[in-house]
UniProtKB/Swiss-Prot annotation:
Membrane topology, record value: Lipid-anchor
Protein's name according to its UniProt entry: Putative lipoprotein Hmuk_2215
Disordered: region residues: 25-78, 182-201
Modification sites for N-acetylcysteine: 23
Domain of life: Archaea
UniProt keywords, alphabetically: Acetylation, Cell membrane, Lipoprotein, Membrane, Signal
Signal peptide: 1-22
Biased composition (Basic and acidic residues): 69-78
UniProt keyword Membrane present: yes
Cellular component GO terms held in the UniProt record: plasma membrane
Subcellular location: Cell membrane
Entry keyword annotation includes Acetylation: yes
Length: 201
């Protein structure tokens, strides 16, 4: 019996290894939050940067299985990262007047003494409807956190503001139409701005 050529054996091993490697699946990575729950690092809805100084986002409002989408871009180089900037807001109906707000903040938690410690939803008159507390720093990359908030009947336009421990409110806020999910970014500067019906998207 003639021994198989060495080249044929190596080729067979290479094909087998390629097939095995192609079958491997990687589960989404998670990090542990200081409040005990896992935080997906590859969560859908997180803001992704394209590496060229811009952040591309797509906002989605879903109710009753239907969704409306809006896509736009924000020049992140224009943001003052000392402020807790709101760069994206998506809404999901949670039944009745309850709405789940998923808010993406962009703040330099690494380069500041304090970190972005909450975001909140307000009426146009400035009355707080709800707040999402943030218990620890989140580096400098944009990050998204969600909270379910009751929106009063007749309220169709709200303001979402970020807050950080050092500078308070300021930076970019987002005015949101709670029925369509449309958003409008507003540069407030270092102090919180006042809003009215004319600011709604």
């Amino acid at each position: 019996m003639c021994p198989r050529p060495r080249r044929a054996v190596l080729l067979g091993l290479g094909v087998a290894m390629s097939a095995i490697a192609g079958c491997r699946e990687t589960a989404p990575s998670t990090t542990q939050t200081s409040d005990g729950g896992p935080e997906p690092t590859g969560r859908s809805g997180d803001t992704q940067t394209d590496g060229g100084g811009e952040t591309t986002r797509q906002a989605t409002v879903a109710e009753g299985g239907e969704s409306a989408t809006r896509a736009d871009e924000t020049e992140t180089s224009e943001l003052d990262l000392r402020e807790a900037n709101v760069v994206d807001v998506t809404l999901q109906s949670a039944g009745g007047r309850a709405v789940e707000f998923s808010v993406t903040l962009y703040h330099d938690d690494d380069g500041e003494d304090g970190y972005a410690d909450w975001w909140q939803v307000e009426t146009l008159a400035g009355d707080r409807l709800g707040r999402r507390e943030l218990l620890h720093a989140h580096s400098t990359a944009p990050f998204t956190r969600s909270e379910t908030i009751e929106v009063p009947e007749g309220t169709t336009c709200v303001v979402v503001r970020g807050h950080d421990q050092t500078h308070g409110y300021g930076g970019q806020a987002m005015v949101v139409d709670t029925e369509s999910g449309a958003t409008r970014a507003v540069q407030q500067g270092p102090e919180p701005a006042e809003f009215d019906d004319g600011d709604c998207p």
